[in-house]
Every structure is written in C-alpha cells, then in structure tokens.
C-alpha cells in the first residue's frame, strides 16, 4: 500500500488508541509485523499552546517508520498549525486527522466523530491540514454519526477531493460506540467510491477476521485496535493467514509474560516508572486474558505500584500457572 509518497510494507496497521498505543506498545507491535503504527491522538490546541505532555505523546522509537502522528480538533487554522508541529516534533511520515473518536468529552467540543455531523467543516479542516502539512495526510472516520446519518461514502469523497491521501474507516456509527457489530458493507462502499487507499477497521480480533475483512471490503489494508490488546502476535498471525501459511498459535504463557514485562519496562524508560506502572495495571492484565486460574494475579496486577511489584507478580505466575 502506498499513501501519497509513503510506502507501507504490509497490509497490517495498528489503530491509534488513547492510553494504549504509546511508544512501548507500538514498538512491540512493529516487531511482530505491524506495517504502520499511529500515535495516540494528540490535541491540536495543546500542540499550538506548546503543552509538554502532548508533545511527549508524539515521540517515535528509532526506526519506527513508516509511522503516523494523529491529531484531533475542529478549528482549521489550529489543525493546520498542529499538523506542522506534529510532523516536526515526531518526524512522522504521515499526519492523521481523528474524525472517529466517539468519547463524550471529545465529541462535546465538536472534535472527533462530531465532525461527521458537518461534512463541509470536516472537508475544510482536511484541506487546511493538507495544504499546511509537509507529509501526506490521512483521516480516520466512522460509518456515520448514527443510523439515521450514514454518510461515510459522501464524506470520503469530499475528503479525497480535499487532498487526503488515505482513509481508515471504522464500521460503526458514533452512537454505537464499540457496541454491536461493525458494518463492513459501508467500508466496501467507501472503497468503491474513492481512488485513494482505504484501511478497514472494526471487529478484527483474529487472523481469520483480518483475511475476511480484506476480502469482503476490497480494502487496501486492515487496521486493528482492540484485537491486539494483550495479543500483539495478531499481526504475525494475520500476516501468515494473508500469505496462506499456517497460523502460528499464541505463544506460551511464559513468553507472553516476558513480552508484557518488556513492554512495561520500555514504557518506564520513556515516561517514568510511576506512570508506566499505573498504565500497566490494565495492560498486563490483557496478556492474561483467557488464562485459567489467573484471577488472583489479575487482582494483584491492578494494585501494583512499582516495577519490583511487577517482577514479583510475574515470578508468581511462572511458579503457579506455567
């Protein structure tokens, strides 16, 4: 897949997820086969006001290319300025505009998926960012605002006309949030309506899902988010499936724990032990999903405060569950 001038080496893309796709997790996913990674979403206003924390979210790991920096906002001028700042700070190969986030505090400000209620404004923002950005621009969007306003096809054509180089389409409306089933038909319709690359997103939890969504929609790539939480090997598995090779099983629990520990150690190096451990309370638990008799250790994980706590818990898992 080629996005503007940027060559993406595989059809597998890691979706941006706030509080999840930090530098550490992106590095793990990249090593396991993700062809494109995207930062957590960053507020355009915060970048324009030189907020240090927001700028820190844009840090890429060495060799993390191609990579995309995602920004959100609803003011064309601020978004254009933020795109330039994000590209300069991160060294990202792409800038992604968030038009899909369904969270209330984002939508209430007119950002994220709220832009799907005003396609003309969304197109103006996209055009402003395209004209200002030194790198190609993409947009992540949803099927529509609700079942009464399914406008992904219309908006996708407007965004292409505005100069956007690729689209990622999630098959749910904002009203659905993450409930119900993703509608892949809309993604297929978007793919048929535009000439730029389309990434299919929604309900990709297995290698088989990745193959199915690509075949059904005709999309150029598959973007997965929640499906790889605790299972970054999904990229490895999906790549095998796409190549018609046997799908490798999930690694043994010992290896999964090693990967979880490494991810948390990388996060601690990047953002400090305290923040990394607070975030690890949910992240480590994801790696234990489906593991019999892991409840005791999940309870300990949500109470850990230091790296030493993490090492102690991991030793217990190795002793009792492996």
Segments predicted by a language model, with ranges:
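Active-site beta-loop-alpha junctions enriched in small/polar residues
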Residues: 17-19, 42-44, 72-74, 100-102, ...
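Glycine-rich, positively charged N-terminal anion/phosphate-binding segment
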Residues: 2, 17-93
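Hydrophobic faces of well-ordered beta-strands that scaffold small-molecule active sites
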Residues: 12-16, 37-39, 67-71, 95, ...
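Aromatic- and acidic-residue-enriched carbohydrate-binding clefts of CAZyme catalytic domains
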Residues: 116
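Alpha/beta catalytic cores of nucleotide-metabolism and tRNA/nucleoside-modifying enzymes
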Residues: 8, 12, 18, 23-24, ...
């Amino acid at each position: 897949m080629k996005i503007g001038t940027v060559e993406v080496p595989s059809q597998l893309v890691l979706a941006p997820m706030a509080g999840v796709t930090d530098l550490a997790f992106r590095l793990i996913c990249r090593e396991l086969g993700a062809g494109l990674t995207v930062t957590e979403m960053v507020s355009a206003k915060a970048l324009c006001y030189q907020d240090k924390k927001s700028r820190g979210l844009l840090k890429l790991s060495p060799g993390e290319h191609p990579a995309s920096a995602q920004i959100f906002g609803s003011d064309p001028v601020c978004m254009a300025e933020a795109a330039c700042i994000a590209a300069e700070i991160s060294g990202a190969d792409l800038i992604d505009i968030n038009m899909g986030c369904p969270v209330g505090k984002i939508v209430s400000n007119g950002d994220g998926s709220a832009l799907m209620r005003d396609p003309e404004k969304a197109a103006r923002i996209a055009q402003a960012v395209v004209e200002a950005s030194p790198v190609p621009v993409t947009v992540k969007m949803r099927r529509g605002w609700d079942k009464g306003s399914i406008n992904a096809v219309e908006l996708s054509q407007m965004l292409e006309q505005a100069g956007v180089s690729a689209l990622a389409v999630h098959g749910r409306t904002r009203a659905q949030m993450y409930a119900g089933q993703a509608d892949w038909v809309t993604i297929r319709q978007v793919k048929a309506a535009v000439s730029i690359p389309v990434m299919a997103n929604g309900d990709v939890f297995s290698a088989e899902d990745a193959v199915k969504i690509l075949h059904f929609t005709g999309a150029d790539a598959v973007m997965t988010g929640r499906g790889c939480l605790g299972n970054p090997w999904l990229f490895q598995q999906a790549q095998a499936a796409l190549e018609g090779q046997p799908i490798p099983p999930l690694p043994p629990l010992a290896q999964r724990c090693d990967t979880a520990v490494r991810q948390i150690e990388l996060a601690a190096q990047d953002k400090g032990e305290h923040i990394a451990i607070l975030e690890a309370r949910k992240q480590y638990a994801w790696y234990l999903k489906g593991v019999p008799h892991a409840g005791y250790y999940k309870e300990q994980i949500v109470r850990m405060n230091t790296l030493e706590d993490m090492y102690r818990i991991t030793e217990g898992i190795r002793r009792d569950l492996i």
